[in-house]
Amino acid sequence: YFNDKREMFVEFGFDISAIPKSVLAVPILSNIMQFAWLFDCLVWIESVDKQFYECLPRIKRSFQEMYRNYSFGGSLIAAKVIDNEHSVKKESALLFTGGVDATTTFLRIRDTHPILIDTFGWCNDRDDESCVFKADISAINRFAEEHCVQAEYIKSNFATFIKPEKVNKVLNRKLHNSWWFGFQHSLAFLGVASIVAFYYHIRTIYIGSSYTFGQAVNCVSDPRIDREFAVASCNVIHDAYELSRQQKIRVIVDAKKEADVQVNLRVCSFKEENCNQCEKCFRTMIEI
């Protein structure tokens, strides 16, 4: 189920040598605990952050609520559970791509001057270069400069570390879902973002909602799951779940009309710029 090297890496734009190992364990655990629960595995680790350790049973319980006919097993066994709570120095960070969901949340919390966090998790090895990631960095840097906020970028192989095609054969048959959509992506993003949050002593990581009330979708990025995630002194808010996509567009349009806020939406997934031809581009243009 894992890549040939059985190795997951994460690269940050700052020195992580002073961050405790119990916190640095969070990114890998945020990607493999769901696997352990699905396939009833035990995960052993030397040390883990106390807040994260205590949030895992709640996240597991949320998955069980989604998939009532499937029994989740597995657990985490840690030699040491360490309390890493610390003073808060900055109010917020935001998982940011420049899309509708992330931009809406930015406009709702911009008074807190969030650190924007963009992650590229589709590398196969450390030397991989991506034109898409470079385009993301360029666009988000412009956005950050226009709005006088900071941006941090993360490079990883968490999306290729576990081979989705192999896991999906099981999940499609038993749960009618896929690994990335149903179990991995938001927890993977929050896991690496938690290191940024710890480094800057951030209180809250915001993640924009993908869906809203009334949409019965078994997606890992769900308020029942995301809001339970916690590391050290940082929590998570799954934002704007009460808004439909059209209502989010209204927030963006109103910000432009009323305050001339600079917004350049980037909605085309895995492309250097909006193609203006795909379903998502057309849908966004019509909504605007």
Segments from the language model and where they lie:
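Beta-strand-enriched, solvent-exposed domains that form extended recognition/catalytic surfaces
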Residues: Y1-A18
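Nucleotide-activated chemistry modules centered on ATP-dependent adenylation/adenylyltransferase
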Residues: V26-P27, N31, A36-V43, S47-L94, ...
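Terminal, non-catalytic protein-protein interaction segments that mediate quaternary/complex assembly
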Residues: S17-S22, F133
